[in-house]
């Protein structure tokens, strides 16, 4: 959990925002998935947001649904994902690592044992996409017991009560939703969200990272100028993977270049 605090502090000292890519673990294969993460870190990723393959990802558009299907086709299970997470943590001891997932995967072996496993492999945060903050008590309590930050989504239409609740219960960072709907860079992020960022700050929420529809440098700049601490890009990253499935070397170099361009946008 503390890795987020240190990361945001370090970036603030350099007057930079955070660039956080999202990928599904095991897409398109476990081996290549680890190389993809290396390529994104080489391009300047400040933290990682990772998905565990799930059969019915409600919050995700077609790009990330296909990533889930490719990982399933490669035989990836949650147990494989935890092995991969342990390897990623060993390689990047200081990088914040977050999971973005669905409640069924948390329930499957018991909520407490799930968060215990997260702590064991060095996961810093977990966002359970289909559990709203008002239903989150058993999840966030288990998370806090195991020093894992519970992450909550702040929708663009959040009212005052919800903003207070997110601020009070969230740790690590706050996932600021660019717009309603499902993930995907097909639909642009709608801005500005400055009034939400200001409110979250007023209520002492964890720093806001803006996600959903972030696919170009200008959107990262806009998110940061609206006061967000950084931006999360998922579908745009996964589309590069999908586009170059037959040419892994090109895929990896494109991913590094994409990460570098979005990271550069956090500096201006």
From Swiss-Prot:
Its EC number is 4.2.1.20. Gene3D superfamilies: Aldolase class I. The alpha subunit is responsible for the aldol cleavage of indoleglycerol phosphate to indole and glyceraldehyde 3-phosphate. Pathway: Amino-acid biosynthesis; L-tryptophan biosynthesis; L-tryptophan from chorismate: step 5/5. PANTHER family: TRYPTOPHAN SYNTHASE ALPHA CHAIN, CHLOROPLASTIC, TRYPTOPHAN SYNTHASE, ALPHA CHAIN. Belongs to the TrpA family. SUPFAM superfamilies: Ribulose-phoshate binding barrel. The gene is trpA. One of its GO terms (molecular function) is tryptophan synthase activity. This is Tryptophan synthase alpha chain. The keyword Metal-binding does not apply. It comes from Erwinia tasmaniensis (strain DSM 17950 / CFBP 7177 / CIP 109463 / NCPPB 4357 / Et1/99). The keyword Nucleus does not apply. Pfam families: Trp_syntA.
């Amino acid at each position: 959990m503390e890795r987020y605090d240190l990361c945001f502090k370090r970036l603030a000292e350099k007057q930079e925002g955070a660039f956080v890519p999202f990928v599904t673990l095991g897409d398109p294969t476990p081996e290549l998935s680890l190389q993809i993460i290396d390529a994104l870190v080489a391009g300047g990723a400040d933290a990682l947001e990772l998905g565990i393959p799930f059969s019915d990802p409600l919050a995700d558009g077609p790009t990330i649904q296909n990533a889930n299907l490719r990982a399933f086709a490669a035989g990836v299970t949650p147990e494989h994902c935890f092995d991969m997470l342990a390897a990623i943590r060993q390689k990047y001891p200081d990088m914040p690592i977050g999971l973005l997932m669905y409640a069924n995967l948390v329930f499957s072996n018991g909520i407490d044992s799930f968060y215990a496993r997260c702590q064991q492999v060095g996961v810093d945060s977990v966002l359970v996409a289909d559990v709203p903050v008002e239903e989150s008590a058993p999840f966030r309590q288990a998370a806090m017991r195991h020093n894992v930050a519970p992450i909550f989504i702040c929708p663009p239409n959040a009212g005052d009560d919800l903003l207070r609740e997110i601020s009070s219960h969230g740790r690590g960072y706050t996932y600021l939703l660019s717009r309603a709907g499902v993930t995907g860079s097909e639909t642009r992020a709608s801005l500005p969200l400055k009034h939400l960022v200001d409110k979250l700050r007023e209520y002492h929420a964890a720093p806001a990272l803006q996600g959903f529809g972030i696919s170009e440098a200008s959107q990262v700049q806009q998110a940061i100028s609206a006061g967000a601490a950084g931006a999360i890009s998922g579908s745009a990253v996964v589309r590069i993977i999908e586009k170059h499935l037959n040419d892994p070397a090109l895929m990896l170099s494109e991913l590094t270049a994409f990460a570098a361009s979005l990271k550069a946008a956090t500096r201006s």
